């Protein structure tokens, strides 16, 4: 999506100038993985307008393969506005109804392309856009399962995009049940299962079929669960958060990077925490996705602090 942000802090209605950047959960993760040195592709649909062209140009420049992105001449590219009313109070306003991305269908999927991947990363945002987007997500998941591609699901709950909360819950529970790795935050786990302990959430998701569950705690780190092990991995303190949007996507990129490289789960989650923390230090959704050197420097600093 194209993301518009007022150049000043305060109510958006008082803004006179805006900056435009590129954002969106799945494309943020793609950029994050590319900056960490991985081959990654993004499947979507954009309008054949200037915003759509800007998105493709930006992602290509970041090394993301956009060869399976379709351009739609009959629908606009989705946009959203990000308002920072005050420090640590960021609000977003979506304009995605009828967008090009909302017109994705299973026919837009390339089975061979998905089959060649190691992981398929999906979120709960795409199925919120339209009924055909829901069909497309489940079709992509079915392709992945047929070819042994592991599915990583980040609920990324955005109730503003859903017509009914019950429908959102129903769809996301089905997605979780058909995924190998599930990455909810505390609010998302509570939405899906009610207010319980982190251990209860982990147990429920494992019971639905996931082999790895990671419960994100924001600045406080994360818990991860497998059928054999549960561990808490602390986060990285950030003195001043510039922009929290995109931190969860950074976490997903960091975790996927660790899994792709065969790191121990504790190390993979630590990398995820580090990437998520670094993202918050820069304004913009994907702009703050760090490069490998930055991530390793932060992790090494933690190790040095522990050994002192």
Show which residues each predicted segment covers.
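Conserved N-terminal subdomain of the carbohydrate kinase-like
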Residues: 39-124, 296-308
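Conserved beta-alpha-beta core of the PfkB/ribokinase-like small-molecule kinase fold
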Residues: 119, 125-204, 220-222
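Positively charged, low-complexity intrinsically disordered leader regions
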Residues: 1-11
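Alpha-helix C-terminal capping segments
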Residues: 28-39, 258-261
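Short, conserved phosphate/pyrophosphate- and ester-handling motifs at nucleotide-, phospho-/glycolipid
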Residues: 33, 185, 248
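Conserved phosphate-binding/catalytic region of the ribokinase-like
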Residues: 142-143, 194-308
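Short catalytic helix/loop segments, enriched in acidic residues and glycine
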Residues: 11-29
């Amino acid at each position: 999506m194209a993301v518009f942000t007022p150049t000043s802090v305060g109510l958006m209605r008082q803004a006179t100038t805006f900056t435009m950047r590129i954002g969106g959960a799945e494309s943020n993760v793609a950029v994050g993985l590319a900056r960490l040195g991985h081959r990654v592709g993004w499947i979507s649909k954009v309008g054949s307008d200037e915003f759509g062209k800007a998105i493709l140009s930006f992602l290509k420049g970041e090394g993301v393969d956009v060869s399976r992105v379709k351009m739609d001449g009959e629908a606009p590219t989705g946009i959203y506005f990000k308002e920072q009313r005050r420090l640590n109070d960021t609000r977003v306003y979506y304009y995605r109804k009828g967008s090009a991305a909302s017109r994705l269908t299973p026919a837009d999927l390339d089975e061979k392309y998905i089959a060649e991947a190691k992981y398929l990363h999906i979120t709960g945002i795409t199925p919120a856009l339209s009924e055909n987007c829901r069909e497309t997500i489940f079709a992509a998941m079915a392709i992945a399962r047929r070819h042994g591609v592991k599915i990583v699901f980040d609920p990324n709950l955005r109730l503003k995009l859903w017509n009914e909360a019950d429908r959102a819950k129903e769809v996301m529970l089905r997605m979780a049940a058909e995924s190998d790795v599930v990455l909810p935050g505390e609010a998302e786990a509570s939405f899906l299962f009610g207010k319980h302990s982190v251990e209860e959430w982990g147990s429920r998701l494992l019971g639905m079929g996931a082999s790895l569950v990671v419960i994100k705690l924001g600045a406080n780190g994360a818990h991860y669960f497998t059928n054999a092990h549960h561990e808490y991995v602390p986060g990285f303190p950030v003195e001043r958060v510039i922009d929290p949007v995109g931190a969860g996507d950074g976490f997903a990129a960091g975790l996927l990077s660790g899994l792709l490289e065969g790191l121990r789960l504790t190390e993979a989650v630590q990398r995820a925490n580090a990437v998520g923390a670094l993202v918050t230090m820069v304004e913009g959704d994907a702009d703050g996705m760090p490069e490998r050197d930055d991530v390793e420097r932060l992790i090494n600093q933690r190790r040095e602090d522990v050994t002192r």
